[in-house]
């Protein structure tokens, strides 16, 4: 790489949206990462292992150029195409996200003597059986790792067999220049468009519609809450594989009038400013980007005590927290906040203050420093 002006990096992920999802959380991260890398020092390319999917169109519309492998997770043709891309674009290092990407990327890196970074983004209940074999073979030889939270780092060390001294925790954060405070009139008008007046209480959940995200539990809590506060509603933002089932589940319980599905929204950072409380009832998470957004706009937060959420939030200070699946405690917390204006105000202020610790440019800077350290090691 002697004499090169820039370091060529290939970011390889599993997919941008997954099944029935417009945009995955990882893809949303790429949307703000890619334009912010220092182009005088780095040429960063973005590739999906799975290929073109529903979310790729959103990525392209945002101005990103994409590459694809286009084969199944364990299809060896991934390796052949990846090697071609590495050679064609003179790639210096690979930054890998996800099982398939991590498998073929590490093999290609070993064959071509290219360094790789494994980036852990979530905690799973178990590693697929075939992947366990892969991780036992490749994990101990992984030299560079990043994790979105300390719990994800621990997961990578325990289940992916990556040496504990190579995994660095780097919180994603959020670019503050993408947060635009909305006026009181705008928020009032938007709520009105969705049938909510100024006295209605809006609870919000943002994210992929998956069974483990806790949407049903939040709706069960809403049923309890409406016995005391009948004008409380939930807005659900996002799409995903659980969408049809969740719609049917809500309809079967006669809740269609108080659970509003807004689908995938590009203006999510504006809409969440209309919430009275933002809910994070997941059973597992890495550190959701939606949590960084909620902090940045100063929302009152109620969250399950899982993984990265438990790291970022402090119960009773920056959020009220509960054990995942505890519907009664979730309902109690919501009622307490809605019935105690000074508590809501305190949570909002603490949320905004906590967000100052998660400037997204710190994440970019940390990644760029790692790229340069790896590059320097290659020259020795």
PLM regions: where:
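Short hydrophobic beta-strand element within catalytic cores of glycosyltransferases
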Residues: 46-48, 300-303, 313
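A conserved, positively charged/aromatic
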Residues: 118-146, 161
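Donor nucleotide-sugar binding/catalytic pocket of nucleotide-sugar-dependent glycosyltransferases
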Residues: 140-184
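A short, well-ordered alpha-helix in the C-terminal region of glycosyltransferases
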Residues: 192, 329, 336, 343-357, ...
């Amino acid at each position: 790489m002697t004499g090169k002006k820039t370091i060529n990096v290939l970011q390889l992920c599993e997919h941008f949206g997954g099944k029935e999802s417009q945009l995955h959380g990882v893809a949303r991260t790429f949307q703000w990462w890619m334009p912010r890398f220092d182009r005088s020092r780095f040429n960063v390319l973005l590739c999906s292992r799975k290929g073109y999917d529903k979310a790729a169109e959103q990525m392209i519309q945002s101005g990103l150029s994409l590459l694809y492998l286009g084969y199944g997770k364990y299809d060896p043709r991934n390796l052949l195409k990846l090697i071609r891309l590495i050679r064609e674009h003179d790639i210096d290092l690979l930054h890998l996200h996800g099982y398939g990407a991590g498998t073929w990327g590490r093999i290609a890196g070993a064959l071509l003597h290219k360094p790789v970074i494994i980036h852990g983004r979530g905690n799973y209940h178990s590693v697929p059986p075939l992947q366990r074999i892969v991780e036992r073979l490749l994990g101990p030889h992984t030299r560079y790792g990043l994790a979105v939270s300390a719990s994800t780092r621990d997961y990578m060390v325990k289940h992916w067999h990556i040496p504990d001294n190579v995994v660095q925790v780097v919180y994603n954060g959020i670019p503050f220049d993408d947060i635009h405070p909305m006026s009181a009139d705008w928020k009032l008008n938007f709520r009105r468009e969705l049938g909510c007046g100024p006295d209605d209480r809006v609870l919000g959940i943002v994210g992929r519609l998956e069974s483990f995200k806790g949407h049903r539990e939040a709706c069960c809590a809403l049923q309890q809450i409406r016995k005391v506060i009948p004008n409380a509603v939930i807005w659900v933002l996002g799409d995903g594989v659980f969408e049809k089932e969740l719609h049917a589940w809500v309809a079967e319980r006669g809740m269609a009038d108080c659970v509003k599905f807004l689908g995938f929204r590009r203006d999510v950072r504006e809409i969440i400013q209309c919430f009275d409380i933002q809910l994070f009832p997941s059973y597992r998470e890495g550190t959701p980007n939606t949590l960084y957004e909620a902090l940045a706009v100063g929302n009152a937060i109620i969250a399950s005590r899982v993984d990265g959420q438990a790291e970022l939030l402090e119960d009773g200070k920056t959020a009220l927290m509960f054990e995942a699946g505890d519907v009664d405690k979730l309902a109690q917390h919501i009622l307490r906040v809605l019935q105690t204006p000074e508590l809501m105000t305190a949570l909002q202020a603490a949320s905004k203050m906590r967000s100052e610790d998660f400037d997204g440019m710190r994440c970019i800077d940390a990644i760029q420093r790692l790229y340069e350290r790896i590059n320097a090691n290659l020259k020795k």
